[in-house]
């Protein structure tokens, strides 16, 4: 897809010190939040609307005001946002998404969080990455949203990784297709935070190895390449990544070439099956259906297979 007409080059980061002083001004009144939520739900007519698809999915009660404090172009079709979240009680688990309420837009967006819970704890910031489509919330993000734009967010989702200190150590295999990388990047970043805790010899969850399989049409649509490679280089004994492109038409640059192959194969996934491994899959429905079925056929317990489809 073509990129949006207006993009903000480079990530514009908000300062940590500004968070506390600005938080009060970001809060919406309860009546405003209620009106925003109910109006958006009632006016949404799409059969494939986020609110309809996720109507039975658990959500937190907190609807928090948030302000856009940073934006960047992650690919020709994906724009990332940093949101300063006002409510101090707002929290999420790695892998979850937010209902995204936009003043003046009747349709509620649904976007996976791609940052780690630690970033929210430290800076009161969450990060989203939104693909350009004709869906009203995505159009707003790409064409209308600016720094200091105000929205409201609420956490939901049953696809997450939230181990407790006493839990048994697990390996993770993350399988991402396209923008399905978003919740898996949140999980990967959370895993890296857990590894840093281990390195500092703190008490906490002892995570095993993490393998990311990431597929996109071309290298230009492989999001967060530098972030992912930085984590691989920081934890070479623990984190590994293989990237896959299915419709590449240009030459792959030298830095990425060692990490790039064709489509993800069943054998590659099968080689990582063990009783200590959890599988997280996020991508287009045909992809998630294929890999979850293949894992079941290879006798991976259903409770070890977590998947989420993006539309």
Swiss-Prot record:
This is Oxidoreductase NAD-binding domain-containing protein 1. PANTHER family: OXIDOREDUCTASE NAD-BINDING DOMAIN-CONTAINING PROTEIN 1. The keyword Signal applies. InterPro entries: FAD-bd_FR_type, FNR_nucleotide-bd, Oxidoreductase_NAD-binding, OxRdtase_FAD/NAD-bd, Riboflavin_synthase-like_b-brl. GO terms for molecular function: oxidoreductase activity. SUPFAM superfamilies: Ferredoxin reductase-like, C-terminal NADP-linked domain, Riboflavin synthase domain-like. Keywords: NAD, Oxidoreductase, Signal. Its EC number is 1.-.-.-. The keyword Signal applies. NAD(+) binds at residues 178-183. Residues 1-17 form the signal peptide. Residues 50-186 form the FAD-binding FR-type domain. One of its GO terms (cellular component) is mitochondrion.
């Amino acid at each position: 897809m073509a990129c949006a007409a207006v993009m903000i080059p480079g990530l514009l980061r908000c300062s940590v010190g500004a968070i506390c002083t600005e938080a009060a001004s970001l809060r919406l009144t309860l009546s405003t939040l209620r009106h925003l939520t109910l109006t958006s739900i009632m006016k949404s007519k799409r059969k494939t609307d986020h609110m309809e698809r996720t109507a039975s999915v658990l959500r937190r009660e907190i609807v928090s005001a948030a302000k856009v404090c940073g934006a960047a172009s992650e690919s020709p079709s994906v724009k990332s946002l940093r949101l300063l979240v006002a409510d101090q009680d707002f929290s999420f688990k790695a892998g979850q998404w937010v209902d995204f309420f936009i003043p003046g837009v009747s349709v509620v967006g649904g976007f996976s969080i791609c940052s780690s819970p630690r970033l929210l704890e430290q800076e009161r910031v969450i990060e989203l990455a939104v693909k350009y489509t004709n869906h009203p919330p995505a159009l707003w993000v790409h064409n209308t949203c600016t720094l200091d734009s105000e929205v409201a967010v609420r956490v939901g989702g049953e696809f997450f990784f939230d181990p407790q200190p006493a839990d048994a150590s697990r390996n993770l295999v993350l399988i991402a297709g396209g923008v399905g990388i978003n919740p898996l990047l949140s999980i990967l970043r959370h895993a890296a935070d857990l590894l840093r805790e281990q390195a500092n010899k703190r008490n906490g969850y002892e995570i095993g190895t993490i393998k990311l399989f990431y597929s996109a049409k071309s290298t230009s649509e492989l999001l967060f390449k530098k972030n992912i490679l930085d984590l691989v280089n920081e934890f070479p004994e623990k984190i590994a990544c293989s990237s896959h492109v299915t419709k590449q038409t240009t030459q792959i640059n030298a830095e990425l070439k060692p990490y790039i192959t064709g489509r993800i194969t069943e054998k590659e996934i099968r080689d990582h099956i063990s009783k200590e491994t959890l599988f997280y899959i996020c991508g287009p429905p045909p992809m998630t259906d294929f890999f979850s079925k293949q894992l079941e056929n290879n006798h991976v317990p259903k409770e070890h297979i977590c998947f989420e489809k993006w539309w």
